[in-house]
Structure formats: structure tokens, C-alpha cells
Amino acid sequence: MRKSWKLGAVSVALVAALGLFGCSGGDTTEQKADKPAAPQTETQTPEAAEPESEAVELQIFAANSLTKAMAEAEELYTQQNPNVTFADTQYEASGTLNEMLGAGQYADILITASKGTMDDAAENGYVKEDTRQTMFNNDLVIVTKEGGDLAGRDISLEDIAAGKYTLAVGDENVPAGNYACQSLTTVGGYIEPDGATGADATGKGGEFSATLQPKVTLGGKVGDVCKYAESGEVDIAMVYTSDVYRMGGVAICSVVPNDTHKAITYPGAVCTDSKNAEAAQAFLEWCMTDEDANQIWEKWGFELAQN
């Protein structure tokens, strides 16, 4: 009898213990579903940050007439693309730039002031032909000292050929000088060896007429040519419209007729030895397509070419 009582007591105690565990120790299925998931103990790997663009420094060889416009464009480009900066851009006569490349000097981009000088660069392997594009157009003008005796006077090519004025033009390395000589062939002021005139002439290798020769001063850069007129060292000079904007101190007497010389264009191309060809090409494309860049070219007297 006592043995049966003990067995019953043990059974009751066991049932009570199980009931207590069920109330306090475990969650029901519904409770588990409502509970937020416990945080993972494994270290979470953050997403990798996008790498910064690689820093690039571009070296540009540009025609002398681009001095102020290109400097402003470079500054704007760096503002928009902080990873791209520019080395000391070389502004020289286009022929001189080719001579520099031929001597082994490094450049990423070449921009000249004539098709002929870019043709020479391509023939000598200085630029990648497939990157070449015409960037700007310009006009040839006859200028004199601002406020001087000739300011406001309409001066023609015939007047120049007649020896009425002292004249400054660029030498054979200066495209502006080539254009000037081409135009003077149409009035007998410059004679080419083969007798070519106007747009068929090269503006090189010939000589000024006996009447004009004593009146001519040659300049190694178009900027120097403009300064001769500004200072009054010569009566007039033949330069680009853009030179009037960038140099100041001169007034336009007349615009040289476009049909008396080859079209004034500024081709640009990536140099063959460029170590930054992709960045160089991107800059050239920006020059041609960015609206703010276009405002800069217009401000300094350049017109975007329609390629």
C-alpha cells in the first residue's frame, strides 16, 4: 500500500514539472513567428567603395592663337573633372609645335591652326590619324593700332600690295602668315614658285613683290605680329579675329575675303606617344560638345567647326 502511494506521488510531481516548463521555458510556434530574428554573429562585409578616378595630367601643344581660350577651357575642365589636370601647355606657331614633336618632346594632344600643319604631323607619325577632327574656324583680318591714325579706315589687299602701309605677317612656320601670303597672291603682293594663287597657294616658299618686300616685318608667332601693330611699329598686321579678342590694343580695318586663302581651321588630335590617350580623347570630345566650353570659344572669337 505504501509502495503504491509513493509511485503516484512521483507521477504527480513529474506532470507538474512538465507543465511548469511549458509555461515558462519555451515559446509557442506563434510567439516564435512574432519574434524578430536574432542578429547574426558573423561579421558583415561592407560593400566596396567605388574606386576614385585615376589622376591624369595632360600635356597639350596648341597653336599660339589659342592661348587665352584654351587656358580658360582647361580650368573649367578640371573643375568638372578634378582627376584631370594640365601640364604647362605649350603655345607656339603650329610649325614650331611639329618641330618640337619631331625633336622628341612629349605631348598628349596637338591642336594646330591649319590643316596643312596637321597633315604634316600625321605624315610624320606624330598624331593618331583616327583621332583627328576639325575643332574651330577663324577669320583673317587686317588690324591697326587702336585709336591710331588708321583706325576706322577700310584697308584692302590692293592697298597693301601697292605698298601704302608697313605690314606685319607671320613667318612660314605661322599659319596666319601662310594665310596672309595666300591672300596676297591674288593681288600680286606675294609670288609663289609655281604661280599658284589664292586657296591653291601654300603661302610658303615664295617671295613678296619688290614693292611690298621693304614694307614687311615677319613675326615668329601670330601674337607677336599683333603686337607689332598694337605698338605702332608697323601700320597694319594680318592676324586672326580671335587675336583681336585675346591681345587687345588693335582695331579691325577689314576682314580678308575668305575666297582669297584656304579655309582657316584648327584640327586637333591625340599624339601617337600619348600615355593618356583615353583621357586626351575625352578632353577633345568635351571641347566640341560641352555648352560651357562652347561659350568660351565664342568669347575669344572662335567658331566651332561642323564636323
Regions found by a protein language model. Give the residues of each.
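Short, glycine-/small- and polar/acidic-enriched structural segments
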Residues: 132-140
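Short beta-strand elements in bilobed, periplasmic/extracellular small-molecule ligand-binding domains
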Residues: 85-88
